[in-house]
Amino acid sequence: MVNMDRENDHGEPEHVRKLFIGGLDYRTTDESLKQHFEQWGEIVDVVVMKDPKTKRSRGFGFITYSRAHMVDDAQNARPHKVDGRVVEPKRAVPRTEIGRPEAGATVKKLFVGGIKEEMEENDLRDYFKQYGTVVSAAIVVDKETRKKRGFAFVEFDDYDPVDKICLSRNHQIRGKHIDVKKALPKGDAPGGRGGGGRGGVGGGAGGGWGGGRGDWGGSAGGGGGGGWGGADPWENGRGGGGDRWGGGGGGMGGGDRWGGGGGMGGGDRYGGGGGRSGGWSNDGYNSGPQSDGFGGGYKQSYGGGAVRGSSGYGGSRSAPYSDRGSRGGGGGGYGSGGGRRY
């Protein structure tokens, strides 16, 4: 079986060295994208995704650094402006995570499960401050008994610490393993209500990012046009029909949501004294959806991107991208319809 998340000489898998770059100007090329981001380290792969027929930019791309710490350096240097336009870099996620609806969510709040009775809120602050500025840490307790319910929420001043924390599953506090997931507000599940006529994450009336086909943005996504940050925003208070990626070129946004089917909620809940009992939704947040939605049946992450061959920079790509459906002009974005691959 081919390892699609290749490690470098330092044992760092590809996804921890890769950034997705959204909101690109239609003029941005591989070279200009590389020229900007190589300020923070050696880039071994870069690609601006283009429509295979028109050869116009879809408004997003990927860069892969030689070392993981270079991703940290680039993220710490935000905001980034490429070719006169502020772009939105986001950490890549492993391909195995593509079935998780929260994988691409942009939130500042973290759900922490597996909280033991001896753990205190200061323990959470002390542990997670290595990732960024902790705004608040709250262990949820039973309103009547005041006993800890086994989970907590930690909020940061930025979304990137949450992304980085969720890329690692090996977190321990006081020698005990804890579970971490992005805390999504109730009602912000992908799928569910039907999408609008505005385009998916690529403009037009094409599918959302995901869908039931094995392509980026298959036509099954988001009820006729899932959007990234459209009428049903992922992040607290953001979106709402505005706040879209890609701007005037069709960009990321519009319509409904990311795409795919199932909603948040199902599965387990951290409830009563730390035990589990039915639906992960707690205190207004969904901690970890169990059903597919984001990405549908597709097994590669948005962070996987255009995977190069073993020769690295300039090799052949193996990741499928859809080439049908409507596009978002110069701004473009993930996803536009159809089934063919190239």
From Swiss-Prot:
GO CC list: catalytic step 2 spliceosome
Entry superkingdom: Eukaryota
Compositionally biased intervals (Gly residues): 189-230, 237-278, 293-315, 327-342
GO annotation, biological process: mRNA splicing, via spliceosome
Keywords: Nucleus, Repeat, Ribonucleoprotein, RNA-binding
Localization per Swiss-Prot or TrEMBL: Nucleus
Coiled-coil annotated residue ranges, if any: none
GO MF term set: mRNA 3'-UTR binding
Pfam families for the chain: RRM_1
Region listing for Disordered, in residue ranges: 180-342
PROSITE patterns for this protein: RRM
Record function comment: This protein is a component of ribonucleosomes.
Protein name as it appears in the record: Heterogeneous nuclear ribonucleoprotein A1, A2/B1 homolog
Organism: Schistocerca americana
